[in-house]
Amino acid sequence: MEPVTNALAFGAAIRKARREQRLTQRELALAVGTGERFIVDLENGKQTARLGKAIEVAAALGITLTMARES
């Protein structure tokens, strides 16, 4: 998986993982306990998406977020 450097890349990674698991945006939203609009906005790279909820969405898709300092 490519490094995620911005909200648009994060959203694209979420969309790819969701589609690979054959989930609809609605199904993912229900699994996480959020609205479908949040999933749409997140996948479209909305920069004001809530970080905590975005992490929950990633976790629901089996994505672990790791931070690393650039050298």
Name every feature range the model reports, one short phrase each.
Residues 33, 52-68:
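DNA major-groove recognition helix of helix-turn-helix/homeodomain DNA-binding modules
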Residues 12-27, 31, 56:
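Short basic helix-loop element that most often maps to the first helix and adjoining turn
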Residues 1-9:
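A detector for short, charged/polar N-terminal pre-domain segments
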Residues 44, 69-70:
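Short, conserved catalytic or interaction motifs in soluble domains
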Residues 33-47:
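Recognition helix of helix-turn-helix/homeodomain-like DNA-binding domains
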Residues 7, 39, 66-68:
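Short amphipathic alpha-helix starts
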